[in-house]
Amino acid sequence: RMAYMEAYIAKKIHIYLESRPILSRRWKEIDPEDYKVGDGFMRSKKQLSLLKTLKNNNIIILNGPAGTGKSATITEVIEVAKDLKLSVELMAPTGRAAKVQEEYTGLPASTIHRGLCYTKTGEVSKFERESIDSDLLIIDEMSMTDIYLTYHIMKRLDFRKCKVIIVGDDAQLPSVGTGNMLHDLLKSKDIPKITLDTVYRYDDNGIMKAATDMRKGKEFLPSDLQENDVFTLGDDNNYVFYQTSDDVLLAKTLCLYKALLEQGRDPEDIQVLTAYNSGKFGVDTLNRYFQWYANPWKEDDDVIKCEDWYYHVGDFVMNIKNIYNPCDEDGHILINEMIANGDSGYITRIEKKDFWIDFNGRTYKMNQGALENMKLSYAITYHKSQGSSIQTPIIITPASHQYMLNSNLMYVGASRAK
């Protein structure tokens, strides 16, 4: 089956490369030089080349690591499409990635599942949408997209009308599903691709410098750091490294978390990243501690229990399994809607065995059983963080995780910072 999907994707892309959408003539009206200046700075030649390439091609890959201006470039392309009175559709593989897409474009974005109207009744699942006929489709975080979703996107593309921009960062982690689609598409000699490689604010932004050096496998920490040493990076000192041992790492992380809360940081803006779900420094252990600091219980709090976990109003949770046909806040079933794996929200109300949760500004009513598909999300794994944007990430790197902590994983963690 996967071999068939792979062959179909290749065939559809070949057709796409040869076709000429009806609205191509509108793209030919643009002069990229008119968009040379934006957001107060000059566009690079590679950023402008995307507009030039888009004029004559129907499918393009925009690749580049964090800080190279992918978001700014896509925002500019969207402005051009608006000027040409063209429709734009945004998709991403996860709810968190779609939310980031919405933040930097100002347009609604959906998960690929939602965009293709995925439904499931019993054991039968299918994508209801028959055709993608937007003038421009932008798929973000392609490194997280597997062959299955790529196949269903390609199957529904109307190549007579729609142009496609695939956006990704090949330094990030591949999809947990079958296939490394971004990597494979980048290897194609036929698909036009723009790779942005100039990292802006490398010297003055500590987080960007750390993320870039991690990606390149370049050492950036002093070799003589001792226990309890603190090292800052960048002119703005926004990357702070604490040297400590595993024996006190958990205690010091908790102290840091508590200090950030006392400074007035919103718990929603702080997220702890770790490599594993289990173990002393795993997600499960960390969430028990951080829940107490971020959202301590009171005696009269309404509490709902699932296994040995207790949840109450204000707790941050992540959905870890797609929920089909959920109920709105009044308990009415939302046919053909879905809460996606990876969507994050917070509990707003609890009544006996029911609770209400806000996902991305929309409230859903759920019963106690739904908690089996959720986890507290004060701490999450690097894999779950991919595609998200975090105001204040706390990245823990215990010595016991050294065999898991490769440069790609560390890069993903550091590049989540806003």
What are these regions (language model features)?
Residues L90, I166, V272-T274, I395:
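Structural beta-sheet core signal
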Residues L86, S134, R160-K163, K189-I194, ...:
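Short glycine-/polar-rich loops that comprise or flank the Walker A/P-loop
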Residues Y8, S49-T53, D170-I339:
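Conserved helicase motor core of P-loop NTPases
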Residues L48-L51, N56-D229:
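ASCE P-loop NTPase helicase motor core
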Residues R1-K52:
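Pre-P-loop entry segment of helicase/translocase ATPase cores
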Residues G40-S44, C117-S125, E299-D301:
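Short gly/ser/thr-rich secondary-structure transition/capping motifs
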Residues N341-K418:
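C-terminal accessory regions
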